[in-house]
Design a protein with these regions (language model features):
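Flexible helix-coil transition and linker loops at the boundaries of alpha-helical arrays
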Residues: 213-217, 248-262, 327-338, 375-382
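Short, well-formed alpha-helical segments that are part of the catalytic scaffolds
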Residues: 10-33, 38
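Active-site nucleotide-sugar/metal-binding loop of Leloir-type enzymes
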Residues: 85-97
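A conserved acidic beta->alpha catalytic loop
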Residues: 28, 35, 39-58, 75-77, ...
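TPR alpha-solenoid repeat register
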Residues: 223, 257-258, 265, 299, ...
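Catalytic-site signature of metal-activated, phosphate-bearing donor transferases
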Residues: 81-88, 107-242, 252
Length: 413
């Protein structure tokens, strides 16, 4: 760390067999010499040769090899907080500000200058917030889901720790908060950190870690939400309802400063009730979500879809009308991207029109929807939402009624 700048930045990360990201990640963290003064990497079990590959990545962008700090540790059992803490503790004593990233993430050019600027302007800031794009459009590159993020803090010696075995979070001691009582924010005109995940990466250990988190921290409401959601991802709908209802009861007694927690939980419960055929409970949950947070779009979309499938088209269109009048897009990690996509709304309208016997109008809606499904991610989400089954159902109905064809879909989609 030979740079003469007053403010020293350390990036720290954990990794295992992620060499496909080395070149991009190192270039991003170095940022032509304007980014990190030090890059600390804790390897958790990569195959041999990972250090040489990282050195080669540094050479490509003229980053001195001595700016790396390497360590390796194998964890059994695995938990993210332990690895994060060990990687954080690799930073040098001269470090002023730390930022944690993963190797499938990219900090945009200019991040180092911006971080130094905001920290120098707010010398008592203990946390620095910035916009983080969790997902992006594969064709346009535009962010689909983004929200404020804060994995940036002062030196851990002042009292910083990662907590929870999964979906780990930074926590700070009282002494740290007294020393650094304020927060700072990087310019909101940019999304500073972008996530480009490896879609082949297994999440097989997540459920066990979430169950462990619930066991270790039974009062942790976010952990309970993550657990209920993970059960739903795996099709374990009874478990989702069990844990989601438990969390809902806690939220009724112990309010938290999070306006989306309860309405998002109602949507999660409604989706699981729908999967097990509990229609009344499903509809109740969506309605409660709308009452709690009238601008939250997800509940409107889910309720409208449910009403369309239940042959209640007039109510479906009324909910869609309310959605257009009331919903406001907020950037939160619980938002589902396709709730704001045109294809989803046209799918719902087509379903409702089919029940009304207006098949030609339904076909128009479905054609418009098909035109909005463009990327592999769109196709995956459309499959998840039974889009192609609905299109084929309409196609069959039109053939039977009018002898026409529409909505041709690829049988492999």
């Amino acid at each position: 760390m030979k740079d003469k700048r007053a403010l020293k930045i350390s990036v720290y990360a954990i990794m295992k067999d992620e060499e496909q990201f080395f070149d991009r990640w190192v270039a991003s963290m170095w940022d032509e010499g304007n980014g990190a003064d030090e890059i600390c990497i804790l390897d958790t079990g990569s195959k041999n040769g990972w250090m040489d590959l990282l050195y080669e990545a540094a050479d490509k962008v003229n980053m001195p090899r001595e700016n790396f700090v390497f360590s390796q540790k194998i964890y059994s059992p695995w938990r993210f907080d332990a690895a994060r803490n060990d990687s954080m503790n690799l930073v040098s004593d001269v470090t002023d500000i730390c930022i944690c990233t993963d190797l499938d993430e990219v900090l945009v050019s200019g991040w180092g200058k911006e971080l130094r600027r905001v920290v120098e302007e707010t010398p008592d800031a203990g946390e620095v917030f910035y916009y983080y794009a969790w997902s992006s459009d594969e064709k346009t590159g535009e962010a689909k889901r983004y929200f404020p993020y804060n994995k940036c803090h002062r030196h851990p010696k002042f009292g910083v720790e990662w907590k929870y075995p999964v979906h780990e979070t930074l926590v700070y001691t009282d002494e740290y908060k007294k020393m650094f009582p304020n927060t700072a924010r990087m310019s909101s005109e940019k999304i500073w950190l972008w996530h480009y995940p490896d879609q082949t990466k297994s999440r097989g250990n997540y459920l066990g870690l979430l169950e462990l988190r619930a066991q270790e921290y039974p009062e942790d409401k976010y952990g309970l939400f993550y657990l209920a959601r993970e059960y739903q991802f795996r099709g374990m709908y009874d478990k989702t309802i069990q844990w989601g209802s438990y969390l809902l009861a806690k939220l009724k007694i112990e309010k938290i400063d999070d306006m989306l927690m309860e309405p998002a939980l109602y949507v999660l419960l409604g989706e699981s009730y729908d999967k097990i055929g509990a229609n009344d409970d499903c509809e109740f949950c969506y309605q409660e979500s709308i009452k709690l947070h009238p601008t939250y779009r997800d509940a409107y979309v889910r309720l409208a879809q449910k009403l369309a499938y239940m042959n209640r088209p007039a109510e479906c269109f009324e909910i869609l009308k309310q959605m257009e009048e009331n919903s406001v897009r907020v950037y939160d990690w619980r938002n589902v991207d396709f709730m704001w996509r045109d294809w989803k709304i046209h799918q719902i309208k087509a379903d409702a029109l089919m029940w009304m016997g207006r098949h030609n109008e339904a076909a128009v809606e479905m054609f418009v929807a098909i035109g909005d499904i463009k990327t592999p991610q769109d196709i995956a989400e459309a499959k998840q939402e039974n889009f192609y089954e609905d299109a084929k159902f309409l196609q069959k109905a039109l053939k039977e009624i009018e002898g026409t064809d529409c909505c041709s879909t690829n049988p492999n989609e």
